């Protein structure tokens, strides 16, 4: 009996020791449960600042010639809430780890990225989960309610204001944002981006007087006095490098079925916009005829409203322009942008036209165009010769482009 009791106790002791050892052994050092926020931020930045090609169909820039594309024809399609369990989840983890380590410098970026993603979600879907979203792990809230679009927009504006305040404090303290692959740890530049993006959101709401407790026009006027992007050096952009995993997204892409859209080509040719030479290649027919790259008649696009087979016939006949091959042959390509100085200048020009702020709308408008030309001049390699400052001046003097104070408000905005 004593022997049995001793054996039982020995087995229990061994079991307890085994459980303890089992737990220790199964702590995977290659799958940590806690990390520094500086290791999360690069992925958060890359996800937000990268750009795909889907919108090029809806924006009538390209057509597909080897199959049917729903976006090209504005067909109903299934949307995805994957932003919640991908990008927004990583933003939430950034906040959690920053709180754990006591690094308040990430607070402003947390609110900015949340605002950015919820802004895009509500534009796409309307009413979406917002106030109760992303609280499954922290609060056990796995069925968040849907908030109205107005509530989401008000929340976005609130969070952007918080982001600006937090980044202003970080900048004044000269705090460094470790892991920042956009602005090299410069909180002041992040604040400029945030404030510029606030103006973009407010202009999106131009047909509203108030959203929540936000007076659209008054708030725009106030933010316009805060630090904003002052040149292309402040662009919110992701610069690529020739390194595995960090190359331009379209490098070595297979584009055999993608060609230029007639809508896009015709608009640029009408305005004699030399940026067309950077986007597209002359048709094979035009090239065989010896037409120059700078000849706007050398370019043609496919009709985005017809069955893809009709555009495929144009490909065979050499009567449709390809996307410029520079996009898939350069490993660093050009930066992808969340928002840039050129866009901000157009926003300010429209605000002046609407009477929201004082200023010279013509100057803002021309600043934006020149900034766009300068940006492409920096990143377009051999094509930079087509987008010089002189080329921008010539473009701005064109009948379809030059500023005309005699136009109506709606015509100027268009």
List each model region and its residues.
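Bacterial Sec-dependent N-terminal signal peptides
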Residues: 1-30
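Membrane-proximal, proline-rich intrinsically disordered regions
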Residues: 19-70, 74-85, 89, 93, ...
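Conserved, well-structured interaction surfaces
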Residues: 64-175, 331-336
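Hydrophobic-face positions in mid-chain alpha helices that act as interaction patches
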Residues: 214-348, 353-354, 358-414
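Specific register positions within alpha-helical solenoid repeats of the TPR/Sel1-like families, i.e.
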Residues: 48, 86, 119, 123-126, ...
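Internal, well-ordered domain-core segments that constitute the primary functional module
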Residues: 155-238
């Amino acid at each position: 009996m004593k022997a049995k009791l001793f054996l039982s106790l020995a087995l229990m002791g061994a079991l307890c020791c085994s459980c303890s050892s089992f737990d220790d052994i199964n702590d995977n050092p290659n799958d940590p449960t806690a990390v520094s926020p500086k290791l999360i931020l690069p992925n958060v930045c890359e996800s937000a600042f990268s750009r795909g090609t889907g919108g090029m169909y809806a924006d009538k820039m390209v057509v597909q010639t080897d199959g049917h594309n729903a976006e090209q024809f504005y067909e109903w399609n299934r949307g995805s809430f994957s932003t919640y369990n991908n990008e927004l989840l990583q933003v939430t983890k950034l906040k959690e780890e920053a709180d754990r380590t006591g690094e308040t410098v990430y607070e402003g970026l947390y609110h900015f990225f949340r605002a950015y993603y919820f802004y895009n979600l509500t534009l796409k879907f309307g009413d979406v989960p917002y106030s109760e979203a992303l609280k499954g792990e922290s609060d056990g809230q796995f069925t968040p309610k849907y908030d109205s679009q107005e509530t989401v927009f008000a929340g976005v504006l609130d969070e952007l204001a918080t982001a600006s305040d937090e980044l202003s404090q970080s900048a004044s303290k000269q705090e460094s944002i470790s892991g920042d692959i956009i602005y090299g740890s410069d909180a002041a530049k992040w604040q400029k981006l945030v404030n510029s993006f606030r103006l973009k959101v407010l202009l999106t709401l131009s047909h509203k007087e108030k959203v929540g407790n936000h007076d659209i026009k008054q708030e725009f006027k106030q933010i316009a006095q805060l630090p904003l992007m002052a040149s292309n050096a402040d662009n919110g952009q992701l610069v690529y490098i020739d390194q595995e995993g960090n190359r331009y997204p379209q490098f070595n892409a297979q584009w055999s079925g993608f060609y230029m859209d007639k809508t896009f080509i015709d608009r640029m040719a009408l305005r004699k916009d030399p940026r067309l030479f950077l986007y597209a290649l002359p048709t094979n027919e035009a090239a065989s005829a010896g037409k120059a790259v700078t000849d706007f008649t050398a370019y043609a696009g496919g009709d985005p409203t017809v069955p893809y087979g009709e555009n495929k016939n144009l490909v065979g006949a050499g009567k449709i322009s390809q996307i410029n091959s520079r996009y898939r042959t350069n490993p660093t390509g050009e930066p992808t942008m969340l928002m840039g100085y050129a866009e901000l200048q157009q926003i300010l020009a429209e605000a002046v036209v609407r009477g929201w702020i004082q200023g010279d709308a013509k100057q803002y408008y021309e600043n934006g165009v020149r900034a766009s030309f300068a940006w492409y001049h920096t990143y377009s390699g051999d094509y930079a010769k087509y987008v010089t400052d002189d080329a921008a001046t010539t473009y701005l003097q064109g009948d379809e482009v030059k500023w005309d104070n005699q136009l109506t408000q709606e015509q100027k905005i268009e």
